């Protein structure tokens, strides 16, 4: 492999990775979110950094935004579009520091962002990851 010719994945590449990873998840898990929009940015915006009290824009890999089944909001958008934000630069930084495949990291972020939003346990999320391998 000629490493001198390889470029880092673009925002569009990340969106494709996210769509592929999401499609590999079990149907019952994907059904939690309905019509999901993927948004890939290099970093979270200043509001997210402030609201989450982050010290660095590298502290967050993704963010779920949307109505929540646990509070009875399912099917009631209240103007919120169901979205997953993936932050390309923090994910690439994480990838550089760990011996994991980039697609596996993106899938993990998707599962955990959706899972935490809907109150799934870590054990539930590990089972979903295992089922999607």
Q: What function would you assign to each model-found segment?
A:
Residues 1-105, 117, 121-126, 132:
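Active-site rim/adjacent substrate-binding subdomains
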Residues 109, 113-117:
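Catalytic glutamate of the conserved HExxH
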